[in-house]
Amino acid sequence: EYYAGGDTDDAVLSVEELVQPDADGAVERGAKVIEGATILAMEGIPGDVRKMLSVMTRSVQEGKIPSASIIQGWQDPLEFLPDIIIDAPLAGKHLALIIAECLKLNALQLNFLVDQSPEYFRTSGKAALLAIHVLMERGGDPSDEELEVVQNLMTDDDKKTFDSAKLMWEANVKK
């Protein structure tokens, strides 16, 4: 309904009603909202991603979704990213934008990709590249800590191609 009508206030109110941020189980309910909205946005068009982000960022800023729900809600989108990309080739780009917006809100740090993401995501071969795309979407140069995250996500194949996370970053920024 929100994608057609565009009433952000109503959408944020719906999120609050679904999550019930002051009640027991809010983190789990918030995670389900984040998961569903993220997968829907990943499979959508760029305009849908922007609409989802306007609701999500406002919901997080206003305390309608606990920040702990974000990482929990991204477990399946991260784990199944390679499968989602088969049907929705822009899914990785959309997910990078979504994660970058949460970094801008200071709702999380990039190191969650190393510490709190599904193992399959970290070992499937594209985790370092997603981290770079997140940093590119966020803008600015990556910090040493963020490059360390990329380095920790690099596979052996990545390391054969790039001697360091910095070189991998530079190669992708030039594209």
Model-predicted segments: where are they?
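Alpha-helical interaction scaffolds
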Residues: E1-K175
